[in-house]
Amino acid sequence: MYGNWGRFIRVNLSTGDIKVEEYDEELAKKWLGSRGLAIYLLLKEMDPTVDPLSPENKLIIAAGPLTGTSAPTGGRYNVVTKSPLTGFITMANSGGYFGAELKFAGYDAIVVEGKAEKPVYIYIKDEHIEIRDASHIWGKKVSETEATIRKEVGSEKVKIASIGPAGENLVKFAAIMNDGHRAAGRGGVGAVMGSKNLKAIAVEGSKTVPIADKQKFMLVVREKVNKLRNDPVAGGGLPKYGTAVLVNIINENGLYPVKNFQTGVYPYAYEQSGEAMAAKYLVRNKPCYACPIGCGRVNRLPTVGETEGPEYESVWALGANLGINDLASIIEANHMCDELGLDTISTGGTLATAMELYEKGHIKDEELGDAPPFRWGNTEVLHYYIEKIAKREGFGDKLAEGSYRLAESYGHPELSMTVKKLELPAYDPRGAEGHGLGYATNNRGGCHIKNYMISPEILGYPYKMDPHDVSDDKIKMLILFQDLTALIDSAGLCLFTTFGLGADDYRDLLNAALGWDFTTEDYLKIGERIWNAERLFNLKAGLDPARDDTLPKRFLEEPMPEGPNKGHTVRLKEMLPRYYKLRGWTEDGKIPKEKLEELGIAEFY
């Protein structure tokens, strides 16, 4: 087999058993790898109704067939599990170097089961795999954890994925961090890892990922790298200003969420933009493995020294969404989240919900005691509560449950800007209605990157679409994006490659690496299979389409108050039935057996 090794590690932390298991190429041709392999294993092996924080939940860390190769951005991996935040599937994706190192060790994935009696970490060096005591690093921040493990194993080459105090304390939006500041962030994967008493996974390898036709693959890689470098976004805006280049663009288009999505225009946007960051704090770019784009930032602050990030989503979540415009405070807060192991989007979203609850008089000063009040623009709130959330101290314990449960506890769940209890990212759907449909139908909830309709609706990729068009063509484009991103994730590539590359380009890379002769349609069918399999998992886990495939009332009933999208709401009711029909699902959002048979997954019906 090429690309994939056809091997994964299975670790049962309850028993201490470690196995290396194999799978054949026919399975790879059906699921490709990474995200696809993971959902196959979950459907085959696990009851979707398990408690996400119980030993019965499985945590799957998986790289794709192009991870660890010279394919542009070939450093991505996925963490797939049942989310403690949403109760549904989550697939948290991360870059850096950890995923590539897993492939260099000779494995495609790690399946973690059970729960250790005491804190442990897993150490992998090629064929050597062991479970080690982690009691001495339990409670440590991410940078301390990585430094300690490197010293213990005697290697600077080792790559580490770990949790911070937030994961240990089962914060429902805890992240898994790797390579210091890269995050598998969404859905509480860090809490699942913490529930298993697993502090870290450290891996180093000496192998080379097998390629079917090395000469052809290198020619294809060179061609695709050149396409990316010549693209104005992948080769221009992203390397020059990082993902925060979007701040001004999204704000000018009137969908940059402010104060818990109360409006979509922020007068201080430039002060927290990628341009402002580059001018004031940027030290250098830091690309992930095999990445020709290099959107990663290294900034320097007097308070924390050199630190990576923040990304666009983090700038917004810890900034405009809280009415905060001081960029230094935002960078410092992002650094705190990375060190403590917190998803910045959910952290900011939960604090924004608390601020609106406070603004409307639902959270009282007497509840907070000596803690800072939840006032918009209060940077003291930002730094104080990030620490409290991670440690579940004081009011931070309530915040650690996420914004939906927080708002629900005060009788106002409508003030939580979530889909399926996952906090929404930095695009108000009243300014991009196809993107809003993507939020509502996303398998992991309020997520942008699995259905990035901002590309056609705002940025013009692959071509410009009216953000307020709700036609079948718009819905078909969304479905294509959802299936394509499932494919890209499963291949082990970054979604930023879609700025410059199209479906045919991914076909070329995969065929050259794997030695297959698949058509573009064959690969998109894999993506469709994965999307439907994840939907099936959710339905088995208790998804009610009528209840869960929706948006917060704010977007459906409150017109945008100002800016280019003034007066607009999201016409979800007009789009959702047609989305179901175009997906081949029933009128009530279920997947009929005939569709599963068409996709070759009727065994899971």
Swiss-Prot record:
Cofactors (names): [4Fe-4S] cluster; tungstopterin
Reactions catalysed, as given in the entry: an aldehyde + 2 oxidized [2Fe-2S]-[ferredoxin] + H2O = a carboxylate + 2 reduced [2Fe-2S]-[ferredoxin] + 3 H(+)
SUPFAM superfamilies, per the entry: Aldehyde ferredoxin oxidoreductase, C-terminal domains, Aldehyde ferredoxin oxidoreductase, N-terminal domain
pH dependence: Optimum pH is above 10.
A Pfam family recorded for this sequence: AFOR_N
Top-level taxon in the UniProt lineage: Archaea
GO terms of molecular function: 4 iron, 4 sulfur cluster binding; aldehyde ferredoxin oxidoreductase activity; electron transfer activity; metal ion binding
E.C. designation(s): 1.2.7.5
Record-listed tungstopterin binding positions: 76, 93, 95, 182-183, 185-186, 338, 342-343, 444, 450, 489, 493, 495
Top-tier EC class: oxidoreductase
Binding site for [4Fe-4S] cluster: 288, 291, 295, 494
Keyword Transmembrane helix applies: no
Cofactor detail note: Binds 1 [4Fe-4S] cluster per subunit. Binds 1 tungstopterin cofactor per subunit.
Activity as a function of temperature: Optimum temperature is above 90 degrees Celsius.
InterPro entries (alphabetical): Ald_Fedxn_OxRdtase_dom2 (IPR013984), Ald_Fedxn_OxRdtase_dom3 (IPR013985), Ald_Fedxn_OxRdtase_N (IPR013983), Ald_Fedxn_OxRdtase_N_sf (IPR036503), OxRdtase_Ald_Fedxn_C (IPR001203), Tungsten_al_ferr_oxy-like_C (IPR036021), W-dependent_AOR (IPR051919)
Keywords: 4Fe-4S, Iron, Iron-sulfur, Metal-binding, Oxidoreductase, Tungsten
Activity regulation text: Inhibited by arsenite, iodoacetate and cyanide.
Keyword set includes Protein biosynthesis: no
SMART domains tied to this protein: AFOR_N
Main function: Aldehyde ferredoxin oxidoreductase with a broad substrate specificity. Catalyzes the oxidation of a range of aliphatic aldehydes to their corresponding carboxylic acids. In vitro can use crotonaldehyde, acetaldehyde, formaldehyde, butyraldehyde or glyceraldehyde as substrate, using methyl viologen or ferredoxin, but not NAD(P), as the electron acceptor. Does not oxidize glucose or glyceraldehyde 3-phosphate. May be involved in a pyroglycolytic pathway.
Family: Belongs to the AOR/FOR family.
Subunit details: Monomer. Homodimer.
Further remarks about this protein from its record: Shows an active (AOR) and an inactive (RTP) form.
Name listed for the protein in its UniProt record: Tungsten-containing aldehyde ferredoxin oxidoreductase
Organism of origin: Pyrococcus furiosus (strain ATCC 43587 / DSM 3638 / JCM 8422 / Vc1)
Gene: aor
